[in-house]
UniProtKB/Swiss-Prot annotation:
Keywords: ATP-binding, Cytoplasm, Ligase, Nucleotide-binding. GO terms for biological process: glutamine biosynthetic process. It comes from Oryza sativa subsp. japonica (Rice). Belongs to the glutamine synthetase family. Homooctamer. The keyword Manganese does not apply. High-affinity glutamine synthetase involved in ammonium assimilation. Seems to be a major component of the cytosolic glutamine synthetic pathway in leaf blades. Plays an important role in maintaining carbon and nitrogen metabolic balance during ammonium assimilation in shoots and roots, thus controlling plant growth and development. Plays an important role in maintaining broad range of metabolites and transcripts involved in the maintenance of plant metabolic homeostasis and development of plastid in roots. Highly expressed in leaf blades, at intermediate levels in spikelets (rice flower) and at lower levels in roots. This is Glutamine synthetase cytosolic isozyme 1-1. It catalyses: L-glutamate + NH4(+) + ATP = L-glutamine + ADP + phosphate + H(+). Induction: Induced in roots under nitrogen-limited condition. Down-regulated in roots under ammonium supply. Down-regulated by treatment with cadmium. Residues 19-99 form the GS beta-grasp domain. Disruption phenotype: Plants show marked reduction in leaf blades elongation, plant height, panicle size and grain filling.
Length: 356
Protein backbone atom coordinates (compact mmCIF):
# COMPACT_ATOMS: atom_id res chain seq x y z
CA UNK A 1 0.00 0.00 0.00
CA UNK A 2 1.28 3.46 -0.88
CA UNK A 3 2.38 5.64 2.00
CA UNK A 4 0.74 9.01 2.61
CA UNK A 5 3.90 10.71 1.33
CA UNK A 6 3.72 8.70 -1.91
CA UNK A 7 0.10 9.73 -2.44
CA UNK A 8 0.81 13.40 -1.68
CA UNK A 9 3.59 13.32 -4.28
CA UNK A 10 1.59 11.52 -7.01
CA UNK A 11 2.34 12.90 -10.46
CA UNK A 12 -1.08 13.36 -12.06
CA UNK A 13 0.30 14.03 -15.54
CA UNK A 14 1.24 10.34 -15.82
CA UNK A 15 -2.42 9.32 -15.91
CA UNK A 16 -4.66 12.30 -16.69
CA UNK A 17 -4.81 15.61 -18.55
CA UNK A 18 -6.80 17.06 -15.67
CA UNK A 19 -5.17 19.57 -13.34
CA UNK A 20 -5.90 21.02 -9.90
CA UNK A 21 -6.31 24.79 -9.57
CA UNK A 22 -6.03 26.24 -6.05
CA UNK A 23 -8.04 29.48 -5.95
CA UNK A 24 -6.63 31.96 -3.38
CA UNK A 25 -8.35 35.03 -1.97
CA UNK A 26 -8.05 37.53 0.88
CA UNK A 27 -10.51 37.02 3.75
CA UNK A 28 -12.55 39.35 5.90
CA UNK A 29 -9.75 40.71 8.07
CA UNK A 30 -7.95 41.98 4.98
CA UNK A 31 -4.91 39.96 6.04
CA UNK A 32 -6.10 36.34 6.27
CA UNK A 33 -5.70 34.20 3.18
CA UNK A 34 -8.20 31.52 2.16
CA UNK A 35 -8.09 28.94 -0.62
CA UNK A 36 -9.95 26.01 -2.12
CA UNK A 37 -9.27 23.74 -5.07
CA UNK A 38 -11.13 22.61 -8.17
CA UNK A 39 -10.44 20.24 -11.05
CA UNK A 40 -9.94 21.61 -14.57
CA UNK A 41 -9.98 19.58 -17.78
CA UNK A 42 -6.44 20.57 -18.80
CA UNK A 43 -3.54 22.99 -18.33
CA UNK A 44 -4.32 26.73 -18.25
CA UNK A 45 -1.80 29.59 -18.48
CA UNK A 46 -4.10 32.59 -19.04
CA UNK A 47 -6.22 33.72 -16.05
CA UNK A 48 -8.93 35.03 -18.39
CA UNK A 49 -9.48 31.42 -19.53
CA UNK A 50 -10.22 30.26 -15.97
CA UNK A 51 -13.81 29.99 -14.72
CA UNK A 52 -15.08 32.37 -12.06
CA UNK A 53 -16.04 30.64 -8.82
CA UNK A 54 -17.82 31.47 -5.59
CA UNK A 55 -17.56 30.88 -1.86
CA UNK A 56 -19.55 31.37 1.34
CA UNK A 57 -18.72 34.93 2.35
CA UNK A 58 -20.67 34.59 5.61
CA UNK A 59 -17.96 32.18 6.81
CA UNK A 60 -15.13 34.63 6.06
CA UNK A 61 -16.75 37.79 7.46
CA UNK A 62 -17.41 39.18 3.97
CA UNK A 63 -21.15 38.69 3.43
CA UNK A 64 -24.37 38.20 5.47
CA UNK A 65 -25.78 34.69 5.86
CA UNK A 66 -28.96 35.48 3.93
CA UNK A 67 -26.96 36.64 0.88
CA UNK A 68 -23.65 34.88 1.36
CA UNK A 69 -22.31 34.31 -2.14
CA UNK A 70 -19.06 36.08 -3.09
CA UNK A 71 -17.64 35.66 -6.60
CA UNK A 72 -13.96 34.91 -7.26
CA UNK A 73 -12.41 36.49 -10.36
CA UNK A 74 -9.11 34.78 -11.32
CA UNK A 75 -6.38 37.41 -11.84
CA UNK A 76 -2.93 35.77 -11.81
CA UNK A 77 -1.59 32.24 -12.25
CA UNK A 78 1.45 30.66 -10.58
CA UNK A 79 2.83 27.13 -10.70
CA UNK A 80 1.83 25.07 -7.66
CA UNK A 81 5.00 24.06 -5.73
CA UNK A 82 3.02 21.66 -3.52
CA UNK A 83 1.22 19.61 -6.19
CA UNK A 84 3.76 20.34 -8.96
CA UNK A 85 3.11 19.13 -12.53
CA UNK A 86 0.68 21.36 -14.45
CA UNK A 87 -1.24 22.23 -11.28
CA UNK A 88 -1.61 25.93 -10.49
CA UNK A 89 -2.16 28.53 -7.79
CA UNK A 90 -4.65 31.22 -8.81
CA UNK A 91 -4.71 34.64 -7.13
CA UNK A 92 -8.26 35.98 -7.21
CA UNK A 93 -10.11 39.10 -6.15
CA UNK A 94 -13.65 39.19 -4.83
CA UNK A 95 -16.93 40.66 -6.09
CA UNK A 96 -20.64 40.65 -5.33
CA UNK A 97 -22.88 38.65 -7.71
CA UNK A 98 -23.72 42.02 -9.32
CA UNK A 99 -20.05 42.54 -10.18
CA UNK A 100 -19.18 45.16 -7.55
CA UNK A 101 -15.84 44.77 -5.70
CA UNK A 102 -16.46 43.88 -2.04
CA UNK A 103 -14.89 46.19 0.62
CA UNK A 104 -11.85 43.96 1.21
CA UNK A 105 -11.05 43.85 -2.52
CA UNK A 106 -8.21 46.38 -2.66
CA UNK A 107 -6.86 44.96 -5.92
CA UNK A 108 -9.68 46.42 -8.00
CA UNK A 109 -8.83 50.06 -7.25
CA UNK A 110 -5.09 49.38 -7.47
CA UNK A 111 -5.53 47.89 -10.95
CA UNK A 112 -7.41 51.03 -12.05
CA UNK A 113 -4.53 53.23 -10.84
CA UNK A 114 -1.89 51.07 -12.53
CA UNK A 115 -3.81 50.93 -15.82
CA UNK A 116 -4.22 54.73 -16.01
CA UNK A 117 -2.13 56.10 -18.90
CA UNK A 118 -0.15 58.43 -16.61
CA UNK A 119 1.00 55.59 -14.37
CA UNK A 120 1.37 52.89 -17.03
CA UNK A 121 3.69 55.08 -19.11
CA UNK A 122 6.02 55.45 -16.08
CA UNK A 123 6.36 51.65 -15.62
CA UNK A 124 6.54 51.75 -11.79
CA UNK A 125 8.90 49.14 -10.35
CA UNK A 126 8.62 47.80 -6.81
CA UNK A 127 10.87 45.77 -4.57
CA UNK A 128 9.11 44.78 -1.35
CA UNK A 129 11.01 43.55 1.71
CA UNK A 130 8.57 41.35 3.61
CA UNK A 131 9.57 40.75 7.23
CA UNK A 132 7.82 38.14 9.37
CA UNK A 133 8.24 36.29 12.67
CA UNK A 134 8.10 32.53 13.20
CA UNK A 135 6.26 31.50 16.37
CA UNK A 136 6.07 28.26 18.36
CA UNK A 137 2.54 27.02 17.65
CA UNK A 138 0.97 26.42 21.05
CA UNK A 139 2.54 29.28 23.01
CA UNK A 140 2.77 32.10 20.40
CA UNK A 141 6.38 32.79 21.34
CA UNK A 142 9.18 33.26 18.77
CA UNK A 143 10.91 30.20 17.40
CA UNK A 144 14.19 29.53 19.20
CA UNK A 145 13.27 31.59 22.27
CA UNK A 146 13.20 29.82 25.66
CA UNK A 147 9.62 29.22 26.82
CA UNK A 148 8.65 32.10 29.10
CA UNK A 149 12.09 33.66 28.69
CA UNK A 150 14.23 35.75 26.39
CA UNK A 151 17.33 35.14 24.26
CA UNK A 152 20.45 37.27 24.50
CA UNK A 153 20.25 40.88 23.26
CA UNK A 154 20.04 41.74 19.57
CA UNK A 155 23.29 41.89 17.67
CA UNK A 156 24.40 38.40 16.62
CA UNK A 157 21.15 37.37 14.88
CA UNK A 158 20.97 39.61 11.78
CA UNK A 159 22.17 37.43 8.87
CA UNK A 160 23.54 35.14 11.59
CA UNK A 161 24.38 31.46 11.33
CA UNK A 162 24.53 28.70 13.90
CA UNK A 163 22.02 26.84 16.07
CA UNK A 164 22.16 29.54 18.76
CA UNK A 165 21.52 32.42 16.35
CA UNK A 166 19.39 31.18 13.44
CA UNK A 167 15.97 29.59 13.99
CA UNK A 168 13.76 28.23 11.18
CA UNK A 169 16.16 28.30 8.24
CA UNK A 170 14.64 25.09 6.79
CA UNK A 171 11.29 26.90 6.49
CA UNK A 172 12.92 29.98 4.97
CA UNK A 173 14.91 28.03 2.39
CA UNK A 174 11.90 25.87 1.46
CA UNK A 175 9.88 29.03 0.94
CA UNK A 176 12.62 30.61 -1.19
CA UNK A 177 12.76 27.62 -3.55
CA UNK A 178 8.97 27.20 -3.65
CA UNK A 179 8.54 30.85 -4.69
CA UNK A 180 11.14 30.49 -7.45
CA UNK A 181 9.35 27.34 -8.64
CA UNK A 182 5.99 29.15 -8.61
CA UNK A 183 7.29 31.95 -10.84
CA UNK A 184 7.40 34.63 -8.16
CA UNK A 185 10.24 37.11 -8.67
CA UNK A 186 11.67 36.51 -5.19
CA UNK A 187 15.07 38.16 -5.10
CA UNK A 188 16.51 37.12 -1.75
CA UNK A 189 16.12 36.20 1.93
CA UNK A 190 17.93 37.02 5.15
CA UNK A 191 17.73 36.54 8.89
CA UNK A 192 16.55 39.67 10.70
CA UNK A 193 17.73 41.61 13.76
CA UNK A 194 15.32 39.94 16.18
CA UNK A 195 15.88 36.18 16.58
CA UNK A 196 13.10 34.15 14.95
CA UNK A 197 12.43 36.96 12.49
CA UNK A 198 13.18 36.68 8.76
CA UNK A 199 12.75 38.62 5.56
CA UNK A 200 12.17 37.81 1.91
CA UNK A 201 12.26 40.28 -0.96
CA UNK A 202 9.97 40.30 -4.00
CA UNK A 203 10.91 42.35 -7.05
CA UNK A 204 11.59 44.22 -9.08
CA UNK A 205 7.97 43.76 -10.15
CA UNK A 206 5.93 46.10 -12.32
CA UNK A 207 2.61 47.61 -11.25
CA UNK A 208 -0.17 45.31 -10.07
CA UNK A 209 2.04 42.20 -10.35
CA UNK A 210 3.96 43.34 -7.23
CA UNK A 211 0.83 42.93 -5.10
CA UNK A 212 -0.10 39.60 -6.70
CA UNK A 213 3.37 38.21 -6.10
CA UNK A 214 3.64 39.34 -2.46
CA UNK A 215 0.23 37.87 -1.62
CA UNK A 216 1.03 34.52 -3.24
CA UNK A 217 4.47 34.48 -1.57
CA UNK A 218 2.67 34.99 1.76
CA UNK A 219 0.28 32.17 0.88
CA UNK A 220 3.15 29.79 0.11
CA UNK A 221 4.85 30.76 3.38
CA UNK A 222 1.66 30.04 5.36
CA UNK A 223 1.34 26.64 3.68
CA UNK A 224 4.97 25.74 4.45
CA UNK A 225 4.69 26.81 8.10
CA UNK A 226 1.47 24.76 8.30
CA UNK A 227 3.45 21.68 7.25
CA UNK A 228 6.22 22.52 9.73
CA UNK A 229 3.79 23.04 12.63
CA UNK A 230 4.97 26.63 13.10
CA UNK A 231 2.91 29.85 13.06
CA UNK A 232 3.93 32.83 10.91
CA UNK A 233 3.13 36.28 12.27
CA UNK A 234 3.01 39.51 10.28
CA UNK A 235 2.46 41.61 13.41
CA UNK A 236 4.58 44.78 13.11
CA UNK A 237 5.76 44.53 16.74
CA UNK A 238 5.28 40.94 17.93
CA UNK A 239 7.39 41.36 21.09
CA UNK A 240 7.22 44.62 23.08
CA UNK A 241 10.41 46.14 24.42
CA UNK A 242 13.95 46.37 23.07
CA UNK A 243 13.32 44.20 20.00
CA UNK A 244 13.03 45.22 16.36
CA UNK A 245 9.60 45.32 14.80
CA UNK A 246 8.64 43.89 11.41
CA UNK A 247 8.10 46.03 8.34
CA UNK A 248 7.55 45.79 4.61
CA UNK A 249 9.97 48.38 3.24
CA UNK A 250 8.85 49.28 -0.27
CA UNK A 251 11.48 50.22 -2.86
CA UNK A 252 10.10 52.22 -5.76
CA UNK A 253 11.11 53.84 -9.01
CA UNK A 254 9.50 55.16 -12.16
CA UNK A 255 10.96 55.33 -15.66
CA UNK A 256 11.69 59.04 -15.12
CA UNK A 257 13.56 58.27 -11.88
CA UNK A 258 15.63 55.57 -13.56
CA UNK A 259 16.67 57.88 -16.43
CA UNK A 260 19.32 60.61 -16.37
CA UNK A 261 18.22 63.47 -14.15
CA UNK A 262 16.03 61.13 -12.15
CA UNK A 263 17.33 62.30 -8.78
CA UNK A 264 15.38 65.55 -9.12
CA UNK A 265 12.23 63.53 -9.89
CA UNK A 266 12.92 61.41 -6.79
CA UNK A 267 13.24 64.49 -4.57
CA UNK A 268 10.00 65.90 -5.99
CA UNK A 269 8.23 62.57 -5.34
CA UNK A 270 9.51 62.47 -1.75
CA UNK A 271 8.17 65.99 -1.18
CA UNK A 272 4.73 64.78 -2.32
CA UNK A 273 4.95 61.82 0.08
CA UNK A 274 5.76 64.27 2.88
CA UNK A 275 2.63 66.30 2.13
CA UNK A 276 0.45 63.16 2.31
CA UNK A 277 2.27 61.54 5.25
CA UNK A 278 -0.86 61.10 7.41
CA UNK A 279 -2.89 59.54 4.60
CA UNK A 280 -0.12 57.06 3.83
CA UNK A 281 0.44 56.13 7.49
CA UNK A 282 -3.28 55.41 7.92
CA UNK A 283 -3.10 52.95 4.98
CA UNK A 284 0.26 51.34 5.77
CA UNK A 285 -0.83 48.58 8.16
CA UNK A 286 -2.48 47.88 11.51
CA UNK A 287 -0.55 48.46 14.74
CA UNK A 288 2.22 50.39 13.01
CA UNK A 289 2.31 52.90 15.87
CA UNK A 290 3.89 50.16 18.01
CA UNK A 291 6.71 49.84 15.46
CA UNK A 292 7.36 53.39 14.20
CA UNK A 293 8.77 54.81 17.43
CA UNK A 294 11.97 56.46 16.21
CA UNK A 295 13.97 53.54 17.62
CA UNK A 296 15.05 50.18 16.17
CA UNK A 297 15.77 51.57 12.68
CA UNK A 298 12.45 53.40 12.32
CA UNK A 299 11.28 57.00 12.06
CA UNK A 300 8.69 58.39 14.46
CA UNK A 301 5.18 57.78 13.10
CA UNK A 302 4.15 61.44 13.45
CA UNK A 303 7.16 62.97 11.71
CA UNK A 304 8.15 62.61 8.05
CA UNK A 305 11.86 62.56 7.29
CA UNK A 306 14.13 61.44 4.49
CA UNK A 307 17.85 61.05 4.01
CA UNK A 308 20.61 59.36 2.07
CA UNK A 309 21.57 55.98 3.58
CA UNK A 310 19.53 56.84 6.71
CA UNK A 311 17.67 53.84 8.11
CA UNK A 312 16.12 56.01 10.80
CA UNK A 313 14.22 58.05 8.19
CA UNK A 314 10.70 57.60 6.79
CA UNK A 315 12.18 57.43 3.28
CA UNK A 316 15.73 56.36 2.49
CA UNK A 317 17.64 57.16 -0.69
CA UNK A 318 20.57 54.87 -1.43
CA UNK A 319 24.08 56.24 -1.68
CA UNK A 320 24.36 54.80 -5.20
CA UNK A 321 21.22 56.63 -6.35
CA UNK A 322 22.63 59.92 -5.07
CA UNK A 323 25.97 59.32 -6.82
CA UNK A 324 24.41 58.23 -10.12
CA UNK A 325 21.84 61.01 -10.11
CA UNK A 326 19.09 58.45 -10.81
CA UNK A 327 17.63 55.24 -9.38
CA UNK A 328 15.05 54.47 -6.71
CA UNK A 329 14.05 55.22 -3.12
CA UNK A 330 12.80 53.14 -0.19
CA UNK A 331 9.62 53.94 1.74
CA UNK A 332 10.39 52.46 5.18
CA UNK A 333 7.01 53.21 6.74
CA UNK A 334 4.82 50.23 5.67
CA UNK A 335 4.20 47.61 8.37
CA UNK A 336 4.72 43.90 7.77
CA UNK A 337 0.93 43.39 7.67
CA UNK A 338 0.32 46.04 5.00
CA UNK A 339 -1.75 45.26 1.92
CA UNK A 340 0.69 45.47 -1.03
CA UNK A 341 -2.15 46.41 -3.39
CA UNK A 342 -2.88 49.50 -1.27
CA UNK A 343 0.74 50.51 -0.63
CA UNK A 344 2.06 50.11 -4.18
CA UNK A 345 -0.89 51.86 -5.84
CA UNK A 346 -0.95 54.66 -3.27
CA UNK A 347 2.74 55.42 -3.79
CA UNK A 348 2.15 55.53 -7.56
CA UNK A 349 -0.94 57.71 -7.20
CA UNK A 350 0.77 60.20 -4.86
CA UNK A 351 4.01 60.49 -6.83
CA UNK A 352 2.63 60.38 -10.40
CA UNK A 353 -1.04 61.47 -10.46
CA UNK A 354 -1.60 63.64 -7.37
CA UNK A 355 -1.13 67.38 -7.73
CA UNK A 356 -0.45 69.26 -4.45
Amino acid sequence: MASLTDLVNLNLSDTTEKIIAEYIWIGGSGMDLRSKARTLSGPVTDPSKLPKWNYDGSSTGQAPGEDSEVILYPQAIFKDPFRKGNNILVMCDCYTPAGEPIPTNKRHNAAKIFSSPEVASEEPWYGIEQEYTLLQKDINWPLGWPVGGFPGPQGPYYCGIGADKSFGRDIVDSHYKACLYAGINISGINGEVMPGQWEFQVGPSVGISAGDQVWVARYILERITEIAGVVVSFDPKPIPGDWNGAGAHTNYSTKSMRNDGGYEIIKSAIEKLKLRHKEHISAYGEGNERRLTGRHETADINTFSWGVANRGASVRVGRETEQNGKGYFEDRRPASNMDPYIVTSMIAETTIIWKP
